[in-house]
Structure formats: structure tokens, C-alpha cells
Amino acid sequence: MLLTGLLCGILLGFVMQRGRFCITGAFRDMYVTKNNKMFIALLLAITVQSIGFFLLKEIGVLNVDPAENFAFLAVIIGAFVFGLGIVLAGGCATGTWYRAAEGLVGSWVALFNYMLLSAIMRTGPLGEFNKTLRNINIEQRNIYDTFGISPWWLVALLTFVTAFYVYKHLSKPSVKVAALKPKKTGLAHLLFEKRWHPFFSAVLIGLIALAAWPLSVATGREFGLGITGPSANIMQFLVTGDGKFINWGVFLVLGIFIGSFIGAKASNEFRVRVPDATTILRSGLGGILMGIGATLAGGCSIGNGLVETAFFSWQGWVSLPLMILGTWVAAYFTIIRPQRLKLAKAS
């Protein structure tokens, strides 16, 4: 059953790579370019998973309550720090995995540091610090339990909001994007050459995230998609050789790398690219902040931003805006401010 994690990861990695589904870009673009398309796509993926998750619970296929007590201080600090990190690293947790598979050396550095710090924050020197902050919590887990309502009210609200923004975006006049003459035909063109619409990718990602639940639960791991814990587990296994660290999630992230590599190679997008020293250092720092932040927050942009939000945990919906805020702050200092200084000098 663990191999289903590998299959799920291959599908997810392939879809994210080919769809250029970047959560860092979704957060950053809302501020830098005032473009909400990728964030709407994220909402669509959350909605698809949320509807399916509660349907599976309703019919008895899933019998899990994955939400934990709300560690508010750790979530607030961690989500913000993670948001800073993903801008410096040039991609979120999953984005860093799939960009590493495309041959970006900066992403290799970010990924290594992300995995290392995630492990250090769990069982290493920073383990007690993480545990202390995570233990400052309140016994509130899900938003619908706190307010004593059915989760279906929140599902309906999320569906309405998402449908409104999807419709609003699709109603805008389409802008033709210049493209080279296709070299492939048929299925090969659709899979490896044609530009995928973010909403199409989002629906596929939502369905993969939904499928992850019963597949993962069947192995004893009561959660869906998750990147930070499995990434830390790989590092811990490599250091200790202890097989207890190998679970469904580890196969998932390895599959993401494989699927992304397949997508990049087949579409001629794989190329080893070595950035300058400044970018390497920035990517390394970004990976460190990602590992610390995601562990404190209890999840990354996938675990918290895509999955925890789908079952309406406080952790998910508090971490999401904090990750966005961290992204915007980092974008200001790395993109907006340098541009303004350059314009001021030119004038």
C-alpha cells in the first residue's frame, strides 16, 4: 500500500510541473502584479478536495479527525516565517521539489536546507523549542466545531466564493498568448507541450489531494497530502537508517520528484541551471526559513494551505493569510523596493 504514495506523488508532481502550479506565485502575484488567477486556482483545488473529503466522511469511507489543538503562537510565527522563506527559495515546499527535478541548482540547495531544518526542528537541537511553542495551544480544532455548525455550511460558503471568482475570471475577455508552432500532436501535445490552464490543473490537484486521503489512511497515516513531515523523515532515515521514518508520505514526496522530472524531461524543460552566488545564498536561507516555519506552523503551503483548509481547521485558515503576509513582506524587500530604488536613481 505504501507504493500508492509513490503513484500519487508521481501524478501530483507531473500535474504541478506541467501546469506550472506555483503557490508562491499565487501569493506573490496578488501583491506584485495584482493578479489573482493562481490564488483562485488554489481556492478551486481546496474546494474540490473539501467537497470530496466531507462526502467520503458522510458515506463512511473516511473515519478520521485529523485536526489538532490550535497551537496559535507557533502557527502565527511559523506561517509568517514560511512565507518569507518561499520567496527567498523561489518556490514553496512542493514547488521546490518540482523545480529541483527540473534541474535548478538553487532549488537543490533550498530543498536540502528545508529537509535538514525540518528534521532538526523535530528530533534535533531545535526539537524542544518546537515542542514548547506547539504546546502553547487551545482546545479548538475545527472552525465548525467551535461555532457548533455543520461543516457543510462552510463547504457551501467556500464553494460559492470560489465559483464566484472562477466565473468572474472566466468572464473576462481572453488574451491571446503568443506561442511557438506545436512540434507534437495528439496526446503528446496535450500532455507535454500545450499550456495548461491553472483552473484545469487545480481541479486535477484537488482530485489527487482527495484520493490521497483513503490511500494514506489505509497505511495507518491519518492525513492527506503533506510535504514537510515526509521531507524531514527522509533526512532522519538517511542519518539513522531507522525504517520507522519511511511511510506513505515519504513515497509521496519521492513520487513528486519523479513525476516532475518526467514532465520536465518529456517537455524539454529539464536543464541543469547554476545560478550566481547571491541566488544560491538566498535560496539556502529560504530553505532554512521554510523548514523552521513549516514545522512550527504544523504544515507548509500544501499541508496547511491546501489540506488543513479543506477540512476547515483553525490551523489551516489562520496560517493561510499569515503565509501570504510573509510572502508579501519578502516580495517588498526583494522585488518592489529594489525596483523603486532603481527608478529613483534613473530619474
Language model region names:
Residues 1-347:
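Membrane-interfacial helix-loop segments of redox and metal-homeostasis proteins
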